[in-house]
Amino acid sequence: MRGLKKQRRIQILIVAAVALTLSSVLIGYALRDGINFFRPPAEVAENPPPPSEVFRIGGMVEEGTLVRGQGETITFNVTDFAASIPVSYTGVLPDLFGEGEGMVGTGRLVNGTFEATEILARHDETYMPAEVTEALEAQGYSPDGYARDGDS
């Protein structure tokens, strides 16, 4: 009798471990595309996603490219200083959005233009998300004067 209880306990532990492993693998598989907060323009230019894929792009708003069109339509280029991607956005921009400033946009790449549905700007004149800073530094650009996450 005692041996059966021990054997049953071991079976339950094995089933629980397999279930935990399987659920972890499935969650990881489901989140595989969402692990990166954004893609830098150089990565998007090198390996363009299909028009059906919604993703985030992040970098700096290129100087001299911000154009306000009819109504609420705005066009500009986002750059990581290795590549530049044209962006089109219809809506109200964040207050801190401007040329030479950091941004992250959500949308799709259609015919070489990123059609944004959401634009996020950095918090203040000295803040830049760590991911944007790392991507810019990886391209050889050092955004001096910007505080990073965790800096005081």
Curated annotation (Swiss-Prot):
Its main location: membrane. Residues 1-9 are cytoplasmic. It comes from the Bacteria. One of its GO terms (cellular component) is plasma membrane. It is found in: Cell inner membrane. The keyword Oxidoreductase does not apply. Residues 31-152 are periplasmic. It is a single-pass type II membrane protein. InterPro entries: CcmE, CcmE-like_sf, NA-bd_OB-fold. GO terms for molecular function: heme binding; metal ion binding. It holds the Pfam family CcmE. The chain crosses the membrane at residues 10-30. Keywords: Cell inner membrane, Cell membrane, Cytochrome c-type biogenesis, Heme, Iron, Membrane, Metal-binding, Signal-anchor, Transmembrane, Transmembrane helix. Heme binds at residues 123, 127. One of its GO terms (biological process) is cytochrome complex assembly. Belongs to the CcmE/CycJ family. HAMAP family: CcmE (MF_01959). Heme chaperone required for the biogenesis of c-type cytochromes. Transiently binds heme delivered by CcmC and transfers the heme to apo-cytochromes in a process facilitated by CcmF and CcmH. This is Cytochrome c-type biogenesis protein CcmE. It comes from Jannaschia sp. (strain CCS1).
